[in-house]
Amino acid sequence: MITFLSVASKKEENDLMRESVREQAALRTDERWKFHMFEKISEAENFLEEVPLLDIISWDVTMKKSVPSLERIRRDYRQSYLMVVADGSISPMVYLRPGIMPSSLLLKPVSRENLVMVVNEMMDAFTEKFDNKDVPESFVIESREGKQYIPLNQIYYIEAREKKIFIRTKQEEY
């Protein structure tokens, strides 16, 4: 399962993002996708308190207090693919730095054509990494449902019981 988190200033942008990512995901992977879409930073932060597994993050840095929030979140999700959504009013010096380290950039106003192009590039890079068996600092579970990458720093413990192996993170057991 691949988990996607989006924080956008408008619901329309989130809807367009989900649609574009779904289209590209259907073409490129057989994995199940889980989407978490937010228009408020506070809601996203509340969701992230549980430290869920996230593979891809899209974050709008034009929203108030979004950059400091993104820096805090990025500490826990260094290995997640990060797409920053920005506009001309924000200097690239704000979001192009080691504390944030975005993987791609989408400029506002978000048009369907630009979004499709950026999502296409993102999916190329992400699926290349996902198909690569050697993902550093991650535990890989392959099953009939697909691959699940669990960052080692999010694993609480691994337990063998009932002739199966269980991996426990803060929020889930696999």
Language-model segment annotations:
Residues 2-21, 57:
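Conserved acidic segment of CheY-like receiver
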Residues 6, 35-37, 105:
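Conserved beta-strand scaffold positions in the cores of enzyme catalytic domains, especially
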Residues 10, 88-89, 111, 145, ...:
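Short, flexible active-site-adjacent loop segments at beta-strand->alpha-helix junctions, enriched
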Residues 11, 39-45:
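Acidic phosphotransfer microenvironment of two-component signaling modules
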Residues 22-28, 172:
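Short helix-loop-beta junction
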Residues 29-33, 43-130:
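CheY-like receiver
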Residues 34-40, 138:
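Extended hydrophobic secondary-structure segments that form protein cores and membrane-embedded regions
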Residues 120-174:
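Conserved binding/recognition cores within well-folded domains
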